[in-house]
Amino acid sequence: MKRIFLLIATNMAILLVASIVMSILGVNTSTMGGLLVFAAIFGFGGAFISLAISKWMAKKTMGCEVITTPRDNTERWLVETVARQAEQAGIKMPEVAIYQSPELNAFATGPSKDNSLVAVSSGLLYGMSQDEIEGVLAHEVSHVANGDMVTLTLIQGVVNTFVIFAARVVAGIINNFVSSNDEEGEGLGMFAYMGVVFVLDMLFGILASMIVAYFSRIREFKADEGGARLASKEKMIAALDRLRQGPETGAMPAQMAAFGINGKKSMAEMMMSHPPLEKRIAALRAS
């Protein structure tokens, strides 16, 4: 309920601020409501469609093999560990899968707490100790228990709405300015206007990515804390330390990467979906 209230309040705030700014700039606000509805439909529509098909998409893009019947003791232990942690966290047992990759990584995805998937790479499953893997699994189960998939989808929907709305409002201001200084009053013209909107979509999109990445980093710290409760602080730290010593992870689709245990490094930390492993380890030790 709080999450939905925050969502509505944020969108109302966007509309209010935009209306005030448009009034100050002398822009006709009679169509602002329609534009916001348009932006929200496409902004949230894309985010929620992505969430709804997240499990299916993960299985297809990552080549995940869901474990229905364990083939060996390692797979049996993996399923039993996830089942135990899910019970501790009070959620329905997620599907458990393995995807073939030499990297040390894992991720959680799914539209809800009771309809989720936890997947680990073959490199992680056969390259880390059971204590380290237990820490990784606890982190992913915590993502599911915390409702992070839905939370970040709502945040993504808000920023998508902002990007679509703001880009077209600013393009409208530019068009009106050009029109007022044009003897024929024609403005930018359709193709030039579309070009301006495209550039603004890109610029605002970068800002939006930074906002989503910021909230993603916060959720990573929370998932680490939850992982420490489910497995133990020592196992969680051991898992992160092992990841820190390993090679940088390879490419993973953005939606899965946001809930992976190990994110890609970036020159600018503000663009990273995961905090640096050193900071995560330090936060756990200080807790």
From Swiss-Prot:
Q: What GO cellular component entries does it have?
A: plasma membrane
Per the record, the GO terms for biological process are: proteolysis
Q: Which residues constitute the catalytic centre?
A: 140
Question: Can you name one GO molecular function term for this protein?
Answer: zinc ion binding
**Top-level EC class:** hydrolase
UniProt KW keywords: Cell inner membrane, Cell membrane, Hydrolase, Membrane, Metal-binding, Metalloprotease, Protease, Transmembrane, Transmembrane helix, Zinc
Do you know which InterPro entries this protein is assigned to? HtpX_protease, Pept_M48_protease_HtpX, Peptidase_M48
Domain of life here? Bacteria
Instruction: Enumerate the cofactors the protein uses.
Output: Zn(2+)
The record describes its membrane topology as: Multi-pass membrane protein
Instruction: Write the Enzyme Commission number(s) for this entry.
Output: 3.4.24.-
- Where do transmembrane segments lie in this chain? 4-24, 33-53, 154-174, 195-215
Q: Which residues bind Zn(2+)?
A: 139, 143, 220
Main location class:
membrane
Give the cofactor note. Answer: Binds 1 zinc ion per subunit.
- UniProt subcellular location: Cell inner membrane
Family, per entry: Belongs to the peptidase M48B family.
Query: What is the protein name for this chain?
Result: Protease HtpX
State the organism of origin.
Answer: Shewanella sediminis (strain HAW-EB3)
